[in-house]
Design a protein with these regions (language model features):
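Short beta-strand->loop structural element characteristic of the AMP-binding/adenylate-forming
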Residues: 2-10
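Active-site phosphate-binding strand-loop segment of PLP-dependent enzymes
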Residues: 10-72, 262
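Conserved glycine-rich beta-strand-loop-beta hairpin in the small C-terminal domain of fold type I
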Residues: 139, 155-166, 178-192, 204-205
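Active-site-adjacent capping/gating segments
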Residues: 86, 199-203, 213-241
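Conserved core segment of the aminotransferase class I/II
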Residues: 86-156
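PLP-dependent enzyme catalytic core of the Aspartate aminotransferase-like
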Residues: 208, 224-265
Length: 265
């Protein structure tokens, strides 16, 4: 099945690009687009549902609700599946790998009614790879209210960690040197350098200073996103709170070294 990548703007997936394609299925992560960190607003979600509704039964949306649990500063938006309803064109996917642990290996799918019969016909003999004990344990964890309380504790902890990293970056960099984005959802943020050195110099400096980070341009599959240059993708999910200040200082040294190296070439 041929797949095509579409551009992302400040509101998420470009509907102009999608409408200009011959796609029958659109795979999207509206809650938190990786790696840009963009959350699709309600208006764009309604437009996406309208795109599918223009060809009923022939267009579908696969909604991967990636990172929807980790929204810190604003109220959560309704999912596409929730907006469309059970008879809508949305296949909803989610997992417990981020909110609990990857080792649980439990994910789930919510199908629209019009696809349920086809699924039961084609996959009626399919057996899941996760044992019933794990599934029933998770079900009890959810229905008992423990999962909700667990998520609340996680959000509090990750928000504090994000705040510590943001404070460290703003201490190490002058306002005119760095712009931060993608702060409100998920477990990573974007740090865009002003007048940045080449990305190749940043990669070399990251190796030199032992910093594990990626660049936004690493995810550009079209080779045309020039605005991605000089933008670091910084994950903080496993960063100890006590190390945030040192992380900001090391990142500053990394960027200085990259700029000096590029100036000498």
């Amino acid at each position: 099945m041929p797949c095509r990548c579409l551009p992302v703007d400040a509101d998420g997936l470009s509907l102009t690009a999608l409408s200009g394609s011959d796609a029958a299925v659109c795979y999207v992560t509206p809650s938190h687009q990786f790696p840009t960190g963009v959350t699709m607003p309600a208006g764009r979600r309604a437009e996406l549902l309208h795109w599918a509704a223009r060809a009923p039964g022939r267009r579908y949306i696969i909604e991967d609700d990636y990172d929807s649990e980790f929204r810190f500063d604003t109220r959560p938006l309704p999912s596409l599946q929730g907006m469309a309803g059970a008879d809508g064109p949305v296949v909803y996917l989610s997992t417990c790998s981020r909110s609990l642990a990857p080792g649980i290996r439990i994910a789930y799918m919510v199908l629209p009614r019009q696809l349920l019969g086809a699924w039961q016909e084609k996959y009626r003999l399919y057996s899941g790879t996760v044992g019933r004990f794990e599934q029933q344990t998770l079900a009890r964890f959810i229905t008992g209210g423990y999962f909700t309380r667990h998520l609340a504790r996680e959000r509090t902890a990750y928000k504090a960690r994000r705040d510590a990293l943001v404070a460290a970056l703003r201490t190490s960099f002058a306002p005119e040197e760095l712009t931060l984005a993608g702060l409100h959802t998920g477990l990573h943020l974007l740090a865009q350098l002003k007048d940045p050195p080449p990305d190749a110099a940043l990669r070399a400096a990251a190796r030199q200073y032992g910093v594990r980070c990626s660049l936004l341009s690493d995810y550009d599959l079209t080779g045309t996103a020039h605005s991605a240059a000089g933008t670091l993708v910084l994950g903080y999910g496993s960063l100890p709170d006590a190390d945030c200040a040192a992380a900001g200082e090391r990142l500053k040294k990394l960027c200085t070294a990259a700029r000096e190296a590029s100036d000498t070439v």
